[in-house]
Structures are given as C-alpha cells and as structure tokens.
A protein has these predicted regions:
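Alpha-helical residues within the helix-turn-helix
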Residues: 66, 77, 83-84
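Recognition helix of helix-turn-helix DNA-binding domains
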Residues: 72-80, 92
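Beta-hairpin "wing" of winged helix-turn-helix
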Residues: 83-93
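Conserved segment of winged-helix/HTH DNA-binding domains
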Residues: 100-120
C-alpha cells in the first residue's frame, strides 16, 4: 500500500500540550470497546431496516417478517441482537411479542448517520 506524503509529518516535533489534552479526554478502553461494539450492530442492513420499521410503530415479529419479506426466524435472530444491545425492547401481549425502539437515542443515531452520508 502506497502512503501519501501529505499524510506524514515532515517533523518529529511532539506537541506535549495536545497530548496532555488527549490523555485527559480520551475515554477508558472499556468504553471505547463498548462503543465500537454498538456501532458494529449498525453494520447490518437488515437490522437497519428493522429499526426503520420500528420508527413508525410497535410491531410483532410476524408483521416485521411480512414487511421485510423475510422469515420470522431471520427477523427473530436480528431482534435478539438489537435487544442485547439495548436498541429495541419487547413486551408480550397474549401469544404475541411486540417490539419497539428502546429510546429516542436510536432514532437520533440513525438520523445523524443519514445526515452524514447525505453531506456533499
């Protein structure tokens, strides 16, 4: 892989004041890991599609499967991942389980992502 010269420093000067600020503000490794794991969840387009459906309404697995033209098993697998990562929540009503967004942060994350990819 070729390295662009413009991306390398021509000087080896260390900026101690900047490094001190970085050291004071950089989150702990566990928080960085957890954040990276959260963003991995958004790396699957099926899960994103499920979240978009849940933006509109609380729905059961049957309705999600029909709306997304997928099997209930496939939807359930993705919902389990979303639920484990606290992006969706569920409630039982009789024989059905209904899913909804866990909170407004989920919508905000998706909307911020959409704004980012639509930038010039």
């Amino acid at each position: 892989m070729e390295v662009c010269k413009d991306e390398l420093c021509e000087s080896n000067e260390i900026h101690e004041d900047l490094l001190k600020i970085v050291d004071e503000t950089l989150p702990e490794e566990t928080e960085l890991y957890d954040l990276a794991e959260l963003f991995k969840v958004f790396g699957d387009s099926t899960r994103i599609r499920i979240l978009f459906v849940l933006f509109e309404a609380e729905v059961c697995v049957c309705d999600l499967a029909k709306a997304l033209n997928m099997t209930q098993s496939a939807i359930s697998h993705q919902l389990r991942i979303l639920k484990q990562n606290k992006l969706v929540k569920s409630r039982r009503e009789g024989k059905s389980i209904f899913y909804s967004l866990a909170d407004d942060h989920v919508r905000t994350i998706i909307n911020q992502g959409r704004e980012h990819i639509e930038e010039d």
